């Protein structure tokens, strides 16, 4: 019997989001990816997070189909699948086809959550590494209107955003008929996002955290979480790992968290966060940790805009 992961309702929708999700971004993809997804389901994971820009959509879909065939889950309704609109499709006329392509790749009829991956657009022909001349401003009103249509058509149960600041959410909400159900952003003890969390709470937007351990191994990740002395001391005192303390801290802030590991032992450890808690004193110590934003998104800077500086990308939230 796997771990029962708590869930939280998303706004006024009928969907509830599991408060711990399984991240699938990896370059190159782990050879044992599909087997690890099946193992994750056995452990109790039900929320799987992917994106059009990740190489994991197709193998994730294959693994989910296998899980259903094996009876590891009784029905598609037991799963919560998130994917994200890529920047080359962040235009009027490309959003719905972009989601339809994602659904075909995953082999699914609908998503539970579809996110705008980042508030910027790239020309449809753009490839990595991003060239400054390929960057375009994000059409808040036009793209979001098509995201709303995706939900109305039943292609996704809910819609949301990722990497949006308070200012960018304010701009989106000014014209949105359906407000974003979720804002998925970087958050961990080293980057606590207090201002943005308060804003999302005030607006009824569920806050979801990626990179709870600092995204070690990515091109922008860091080891500041795993090497932090405050977290190490708390972990030692509690007989837990630093990773467990960091994930528990995020969970204890009342937000959902996307964890990622293909190591079977750590996959299990990442779920061992529900039957213990951090004390008020420990929370206070963590709150005083010096802050550092890992994901700065410098790839989207251009002398011609829309973002000329990192400060402009994050509206000073750095």
UniProtKB/Swiss-Prot annotation:
Q: Which organism is it from?
A: Citrus sinensis
Tissue specificity, in the record's words, reads: Expressed in flowers, maturing fruits and in juice vesicles.
Role according to the record: Aldo-keto reductase involved in the biosynthesis of limonoids triterpene natural products such as limonin, a compound with insecticidal activity responsible for the bitter taste in citrus. Can use (1S)-1,7-diacetoxy-luvungin A as substrate.
Q: What's the protein here called?
A: (1S)-1,7-diacetoxy-luvungin A aldo-keto reductase
Q: Which Gene3D superfamilies match?
A: NADP-dependent oxidoreductase domain
Q: Which residues are named in the active-site annotation?
A: 54 (proton donor)
Q: In which pathway does it act?
A: Secondary metabolite biosynthesis; terpenoid biosynthesis
Any one GO molecular-function label of the UniProt entry = oxidoreductase activity, acting on the CH-OH group of donors, NAD or NADP as acceptor
Stated family: Belongs to the aldo/keto reductase family.
Q: Which InterPro entries match?
A: AKR (IPR020471), AKR4A/B (IPR044497), Aldo/ket_reductase_CS (IPR018170), NADP_OxRdtase_dom (IPR023210), NADP_OxRdtase_dom_sf (IPR036812)
Recorded superkingdom = Eukaryota
Q: Reaction(s) catalyzed by this protein?
A: (1S)-1,7-diacetoxy-luvungin A + AH2 + H2O = (1R,2R,3S,8R,10R,11R,15S,16S)-3-(acetyloxy)-15-[(4R)-4-[(2S)-3,3-dimethyloxiran-2-yl]-1,4-dihydroxybutan-2-yl]-2,7,7,11,16-pentamethyl-5-oxo-6-oxatetracyclo[9.7.0.0(2,8).0(12,16)]octadec-12-en-10-yl acetate + acetate + A + H(+)
The UniProt record lists the EC number as 1.1.1.-
User: Sorted alphabetically, which keywords does the UniProt record give?
Assistant: Oxidoreductase
